[in-house]
Every structure is written in structure tokens, then in C-alpha cells.
Amino acid sequence: MVNVPKTRRTFCDGKCRRHTMHKVTQYKKGKESRLAQGRRRYDSKQKGFGGQTKPIFRKKAKTTKKIVLRMECTECKHRKQLPIKRCKHFELGGQKKTRGQVIQF
């Protein structure tokens, strides 16, 4: 389990050019546009008779995705993305573990 704090003091490569506080969120893929060239080509190819025209990918190899942190500078609002390692469980701003304490569920 990876636990990342909601704020982080790191270098801002926008206007600030110095270490500032950044607000951390997890990157999420946006909604795909129906007007993108590949999507338009695929839709026109699929039209009419002839069934599925392109192969549907079924040989999935990975069980996890790489976590990408999206950091926004609190001063100039410049955003940057930071990929971290693969993990099955990711937590943002969870409780910090303390030494010698019993874990409660």
C-alpha cells in the first residue's frame, strides 16, 4: 500500500522557479473525444456490413498501472505530473503509520 500526502514541497518549474508547496492529486484519464482522427476513422470503418474490422486486444499482461501524481503549485497554479512505481493499493492523504501501534480494521 502506497500512502502519499496531499501536499508536498517541491521545485516549481513554472514562473516561480523555486521550491513551493504543491497540491497533489491522482491523474485520471479524460473522456475520449469522438472527433479525434483515429476515432472518426474507426467509426467510419465499423459502419455497414462486415463485423468487427480491427482486432480487439485480449492478451493483457500487466496487473497494475503506474500511479501518476498531478502536482499543482499553490502560488502560480502551474501543474506537473510525476509518475511513481506500480502498486495495487494507492492512498492519497491517508493516516500516517505510527511506530509500535496495533493496526485496527
Swiss-Prot record:
User: Which GO biological process entries does UniProt record here?
Assistant: translation
Q: What S-S linkages are listed for this chain?
A: none
Which Gene Ontology terms of cellular component type are present?
Answer: ribonucleoprotein complex; ribosome
Q: Where is this region: Disordered?
A: 23-52
Annotated keywords: Ribonucleoprotein, Ribosomal protein
Concerning Gene3D superfamilies, the annotation shows: 3.10.450.80
Which Pfam families does the UniProt entry name for this protein? Ribosomal_L44 (PF00935)
Note the PROSITE patterns from the entry.
Answer: RIBOSOMAL_L44E
Q: What GO molecular functions are on record for this protein?
A: structural constituent of ribosome
Locations of Basic and acidic residues compositional bias? 29-46
Which family, according to the similarity comment?
Answer: Belongs to the eukaryotic ribosomal protein eL42 family.
Checking PANTHER family in the record gives: 60S RIBOSOMAL PROTEIN L36A/L44
Q: What is this protein called?
A: Large ribosomal subunit protein eL42
Q: Which organism is it from?
A: Brugia malayi (Filarial nematode worm)
The gene from which this protein is expressed is rpl-44
